[in-house]
């Protein structure tokens, strides 16, 4: 696989573009682990983002009913069309965060790390069965961080409100070419059956001051909700979980706060 990559890079005169986060996966075992974790079968319609030179795409095409792969680099698309004769792969050119996604039931992808956050938030709002995605390790650790921990963030809260998230394996820098500056992780995401849909503006407002207590965080960022401090003065100290700091809140507790603010006409 490594030799094949270098052959193709040389054949087509490709220099990986760091500006769009091009790091090509060169370890077959990681590809196999991703496909195994996703439990890919002949009935699946797969979404992939950033196919690179097609190594993961090719294995998905052998096992899935259909593969949609999104690639922003026109030169890479031309190479894929020349090198492979897939009849069940559709290549979509564009920015994966901005283009409309086709219908799919699973995601298997080594995404460009620069789009990790917007890609993940978009994915969590989409109907799917299972996603297996390679992320920067630091990002993955934030996704699975527990309330009260150092890494717990808006990302942690939103990911865990909508999905069950698990780090399947850690991946060293040597699994990619060119070698990235960071370690990676393979992450499994499955939608929660009891999804907690939260007001995103409220979550953003709270996490502007993640180490402050809930009342203080709301007072200091209430303008983000289009409300003045005068409008909340009489109710803010009775907000649910007022003794907690923002980074200690579980998704269910943020929902309690949201419902309280709705009841008092602060948010709709």
Curated annotation (Swiss-Prot):
This is Probable ribosomal RNA small subunit methyltransferase A. One of its GO terms (molecular function) is rRNA (adenine-N6,N6-)-dimethyltransferase activity. Belongs to the class I-like SAM-binding methyltransferase superfamily. rRNA adenine N(6)-methyltransferase family. RsmA subfamily. The gene is rsmA. The lineage of its organism: Archaea, Methanobacteriati, Methanobacteriota, Thermococci, Thermococcales. It is found in: Cytoplasm. GO terms for cellular component: cytoplasm. It comes from the Archaea. Specifically dimethylates two adjacent adenosines in the loop of a conserved hairpin near the 3'-end of 16S rRNA in the 30S particle. May play a critical role in biogenesis of 30S subunits. Pfam families: RrnaAD. It is an enzyme of class 2 (transferase).
